[in-house]
Amino acid sequence: KWLYDKIGQAAWACADPGVQFDTTINEWHTCPKDGRINASNPCSEYMFLDDTACNLASINLIHFINDSGHFNEEKFAHACELMTIVLEISVTMAQFPSDEIAKRSWEYRTLGLGFANLGTLLMVKGISYDSDEARSIAGGISAIMCGTAYETSAKLAKHLGPFNRYEHNKDDMLRVIRNHRRAAYNVSNEEYEKLEITPVGIDENL
């Protein structure tokens, strides 16, 4: 507890250090047949194989709140779909720091979609940042983004073909997607596949 208090205080004061849980990271790895995840970029939004990279994009959540404080899930999902397509196109246009990183990033077609302004959204809605309700909202928004991105990726793959290393990692990738779906529906721990530590599911009552 003392150590976590120190880490939490330091992260609040200057955004460092970050804590990464190696077992969990690699159990949610979509391409483990090609190697383990050893590290992330400094801000930790990108975790994947060594010598890969991706372009990042963040969707501003506050644009999906109306005057009454309601979050428009449909418009947000549509934005996630559009940005997934944009990032997919960007793979062939990006400038990478080395030929090896460019080659591997093309083989996996990695993209980085995220959101910004969660804190502002919660303030507008009058919800405490450190509350079960806030965590449920963050989980729900993440689930919509993740599910929409995977769905859009599948639609693109249907027309253009999957990324080069998909077949080699297909079973693991589909297992990870199934586990994401289970977390979104807050299933019992026994339903998860190959996880030592199961996630906290989304409580729809919050």
At which residue positions do the language-model features occur?
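Function-dense linear segments that define catalytic or interfacial modules
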Residues: 11-125
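Internal maturation/activation junctions in enzymes
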Residues: 79-102, 106, 110, 127-206
